[in-house]
Amino acid sequence: MVNLEELSLKRNNMKRTETTFTDISGKRYQVANINEENSESNRIELNRTSGFVIDTKPDDLSHKIEIIIPQSILNNNNNNYESINLYIGSQDAAFNKLDLQLKNIKSILNVGIGINNLFTKENSDINDGFIINYCNVEIFDDVNFNIIEKFDKCFEFIDSNIGGVENNGILVHCNAGVSRSATILISYLMKKLKIPLSLSLEILKSSRPQCKPNQGFLKQLEIFEKELLF
């Protein structure tokens, strides 16, 4: 049986609290009494916010793929790995002119969706003549997307633009630099260096810990590994 008198006593002994909430316009309010209704008269307006979360740590650096191959599987097919000057990053990294210049990145493989190429020949006047060679391959970060059919075009672009006399670098990026770009680079290293999926994935994660192909892409990488017949 509910004791109404006891409940009333507990209610009266409850401590006042301050509840803060934000409306869709970004206004922040505080209601000082837990027993009061959230009416306009009971609100104390606080400083306005942006209405969205502000990223205080922009992910705007390209990460070099540091290739380390165990001596046990080092062979004539993959002993030239030191000349592979590959980078991975998010869309922010593709806009970081200073970082691209410092790392001698001359080509960018854009496998994201809706990301503009900033340093094109058409924009060279406003970028002090800085020009990047681009290739766009639209890939959706969807477990059902057939990413294997995009491999050949991506590999061809990488092979055509990497290295050279100046050891030019290539940045492979998507929107977040986590799933799509990682999958392309994992598959490229598997084929180029004739190394297993597990090692290629380990190399990517050691260079950029955020790398995490979605489950559908991982399944396709397993299929691709079998096709390579190591």
Swiss-Prot record:
Molecular function GO terms recorded: JUN kinase phosphatase activity; protein serine/threonine phosphatase activity; protein tyrosine phosphatase activity
GO biological process: regulation of JNK cascade
Keywords associated with the record: Hydrolase, Protein phosphatase
Reaction catalysed by this enzyme: O-phospho-L-tyrosyl-[protein] + H2O = L-tyrosyl-[protein] + phosphate; O-phospho-L-seryl-[protein] + H2O = L-seryl-[protein] + phosphate; O-phospho-L-threonyl-[protein] + H2O = L-threonyl-[protein] + phosphate
UniProt KW Hydrolase keyword: yes
Database matches in SUPFAM superfamilies: (Phosphotyrosine protein) phosphatases II
Residue ranges of domain Tyrosine-protein phosphatase in the record: 78-230
The keyword Hydrolase is annotated on this UniProt entry: yes
Major enzyme class: hydrolase
GO CC term, one of those recorded: cytoplasm
Residue positions of the active site: 174 (phosphocysteine intermediate)
Listed EC numbers: 3.1.3.16, 3.1.3.48
A Pfam family hit: DSPc
Annotated PROSITE patterns: TYR_PHOSPHATASE_1, TYR_PHOSPHATASE_2, TYR_PHOSPHATASE_DUAL
Function: Has a dual specificity toward Ser/Thr and Tyr-containing proteins.
Protein family: Belongs to the protein-tyrosine phosphatase family. Non-receptor class dual specificity subfamily.
Protein name: Probable dual specificity protein phosphatase DDB_G0283417
Source organism: Dictyostelium discoideum (Social amoeba)
